[in-house]
Amino acid sequence: MTHYYTYDTILGSVTFVEENGALVVITTRPYHPKEGIYQETPVIKEAFRQLSEYFSGKRKTFNLPLLLKGTDFQKQVWQALLKIPFGETRSYKQIAETIGNPKAVRAVGMANNKNPLLIVVPCHRVIGANGKLVGYAVGLDKKEYLLRLEGSLL
């Protein structure tokens, strides 16, 4: 069973989607499911609580049930993103090297763009090789905000 619920946050409206007890989507984009119940569940409520703590500077890691849905390559990239510590960044090239596919820099960028679990799977922590902010599916202004919040952008 799919449940989803939208909250207002400092980044605007954020929708959380849960399937069978695990989060599958966290997005700031409009979310229109084919099926599902618009209902706040314990998992969704906990995800919002942890995200609120993150926004207020009280949380650096998330402890939530996640179900990553994507290609094997995408899931490999997203698993690598989960290992980037709070307050640190990595380049797309570094992620490609981490997953053992150093020539897949553009593919890493595409996997980042398809990340369904914003913030919790921290694709915002991936920057260009030159240290510049590039590519964030929901806007570079939000990426900059998140990196400043984490202290990795001064």
Describe the predicted segments one by one.
Residues 1-62, 131-154:
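Low-complexity, small/basic-enriched stretches
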Residues 64-70:
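Short amphipathic alpha-helical boundary/capping segments
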